[in-house]
Amino acid sequence: MNKKPSKYFPSLNRTDYKNCNFLCNGFSLKPNEKKSSKNASMASKLLTTFFLIFFVLDIDLVATSMTSVSSAVEVLSDSGYLSMGLTLKLANQDLNLEDWQELTLFAPSDQSFSKFGQPSLLDMKYQLSPTRLPGETLRNLPNGAKIPTLRSNYSLTVTNSSRFGGKTSINNVVVQDSPVFDDGYVVIYGSDEFFTSPTKISDDSSSSSSIPSTTSSTGSIPIPSSATQTPPSPNIASDSTRNLPNRSKPVNRFNIFESASRLLMSRGFVIIATFLALQLEDNTSGNDTKITVFAPIDEAIPNPTTKFSDYVTIFRGHVVSQLLLWKDLQKFAKEGSILQTVLKGYEIEISLSGDILLLNGVPLIYPDLYVNDWIAVHGFNQMIVTKEKQVDVGDSITVLNNGEQEEEGVHGEYSSELGDYGLH
C-alpha cells in the first residue's frame, strides 16, 4: 500500500518526515517569525500613516485658517467691495485676524467709503465678530440680540423693525442676510453703511425703544471657545481725536490722513485714499516726516484683481517723503530735479513740456488737490511709472528716512507690510 505523501513534503514518506523533525522544527519557527515581523511592520506603517494623516490635516486646518482671510479679500474685491478688501488686507497686519478660527465681517460698499470716509482700526474692529454667523442664524436672531465684536466690551445690536421692510438690521443699518462669502470659517455680509459707533448707539438707546438697552433679557451671542487669542490692540487715535485738521500741528497725523482720504474718496481716488487712510501711526516717536502723494485715479490703475502686494507697491511708488506744493514742483521741474520715492531704489523725474508739468512723462492734472502743513496730494489721470535709480544721477533731491538717507540700490522684493506711516 502506498503511503500518502506528506502534506508539506510530498516527496518524503512518514518515516523520513519523522527523521527530519529537527529540520522541520527549525523551519517551523520561520513562519511565526515572518508573521511577527510582518505584524510589526504593518503596525509601524499604520502608525506612520496615522501621524502623516494627522500632520497633513493639521497643516490643512492651519492653511485653511490662514488663507480664509486672503480668500475673503479677493472675493470682496470681485464683489464690489474693493475698499473693504483693501482695508481688510492692510488692517489684518495689525489685527492678526488669522488668530481667530471663526470670523463674521460686515462689509460696507465702496459708496459708503466715499460717503463716510476710511474707518480707523478701532472702527474696523466694530465691523468684525469673532464668531461665525451663517445666513440662517443671522436671519433668525431676535430683535435686541447682541453680537460680540473684536472691539473689547462692545457688541452689535440686532435692530429689526418694520421700518426696514422686513430686512435684517444691525445697529439701525440694513445688512444683507445672504453672505457674500462663506468658507466655513469666515462669513462676510454686505451692509448699507458703517455701523454707528458704540457711543452714538448708547445715546440713541436712551431715547428710542427700537434699540434695547444693554440690560435687556434678550440673549447674547457668546464668543466661541475656539477664539482664545485676542489680537493685540494697535496704537491708534481715540474716537475723540478724529477731527478735521487745520493749519496748526495736529496731535497725531491720522487726523490729516483721514481728512485727505475723505477728499480723495469723493474725487474718484478710492484705491490711493484707502492706503492713505490706513497710515495710522501717531507722532509720539517725534517723527516729523512730511509727505507728498501723487494720486492716480482708480481707472488708471490696471486690473482691479491684481495682487494686493502690487497695490502696496503702486502706493509706495507714488509717495515721496517731502512736502511739495505746486510751486515747489514747478521750481524743481525747471531744475530737472529727481525725487526719490519711498519705494526704495525708484525715483521720479520732474520736467516741463511747455507749461505742463510732467512726472516721468505723466502730466499733472490736479495740482494741490489737498494741502496742509504735513501732506500734499496732487492728482493724475495716469499712473506714474517709477524708474530704477541710477548710480550717477547728478544733482538729485535727498530724501530722509527717519533722519537717515534712503538706502541705495534697486528695490528687489516688495513687502506688503507698511512701516511708520506705511511709507518705508
Curated annotation (Swiss-Prot):
Ranges annotated as biased composition (Low complexity): 199-226
InterPro entries (UniProt xref): FAS1_dom_sf (IPR036378), FAS1_domain (IPR000782), Fasciclin-like_AGP (IPR052806)
UniProt KW Ribosomal protein keyword: no
Primary location class: membrane
Gene3D superfamilies linked: FAS1 domain
Gene Ontology CC terms, in alphabetical order: membrane
All copies of domain FAS1, residue ranges: 56-194, 250-384
TM annotation in the entry: 46-66
Subcellular location: Membrane
Membrane topology note: Single-pass membrane protein
Compositionally biased residues, Polar residues: 227-246
Pfam families: Fasciclin
Positions of disulphide bridges: none
Region (Disordered): 199-246, 405-424
SMART domains: FAS1
Family of this protein: Belongs to the fasciclin-like AGP family.
Name of the molecule in the record: Putative fasciclin-like arabinogalactan protein 20
High-level lineage: Eukaryota, Viridiplantae, Streptophyta, Embryophyta, Tracheophyta
